[in-house]
Amino acid sequence: MFRPILRLWLLIFVPFAILPFTLLSGNVVPSTALWGHAVFHLIYLPILVVGWWALWRFVREPSNLALRVIAALILLCQTSGLLGHAGELVSVVQRGFFSAPHSIFSENPHLFFAHFGLWGIVASEVLLLILTATAAVQRLLRRPPSATVGQASTSA
């Protein structure tokens, strides 16, 4: 059960932690270079699609209802993130893509889709933590109680 969850971490959490830091924060790509934002959309959209596909497979996989429900909620949030991210990309392409003006960040279509996508992605990150904790607790509860060393049954 932990291999599919590890796959979800690699497809959902890791790209969201690395890509904004490298392309949007100004630490690697200068914050004045708006092409970093467009490249972020181009790279992150296929990652979201692959993560959505992995979630779809995960929802059908576990026999545990709690894990299926949490994974279905993550799938719903990832769908919101995917649609919001695609909407952002479309609004950036309409305004000039790599040469889009800085004012695009305050314009309604980009802003709407940015909020729509960001909150879906953040909610899926939180739900991924909950999914992992739930799977870990259920794994601990399924373990058979081990016999302690040194206890002997006494018969009187």
Task: Give the label of every model feature segment.
Residues 4-13, 94-144:
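Alpha-helical membrane-associated segments of multi-pass integral membrane proteins
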Residues 4-7, 35-45, 65-75, 112-126:
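Alpha-helical transmembrane segments of integral membrane proteins
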Residues 26-40, 81-119:
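Interfacial non-cytosolic loop connecting adjacent transmembrane helices
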Residues 51-89:
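Loop-to-transmembrane helix junctions at the membrane interface
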Residues 12-19, 40-43, 47-50, 77-87, ...:
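Membrane-embedded alpha-helical transmembrane segments of multi-pass integral membrane proteins
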Residues 1-47:
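N-terminal signal-anchor transmembrane alpha-helix
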Residues 24, 28, 41, 45, ...:
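Alpha-helical and His/Cys-centered functional microenvironments
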Residues 2, 55-63, 126-156:
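Cytosolic juxtamembrane helix at the C-terminal end of the final transmembrane segment
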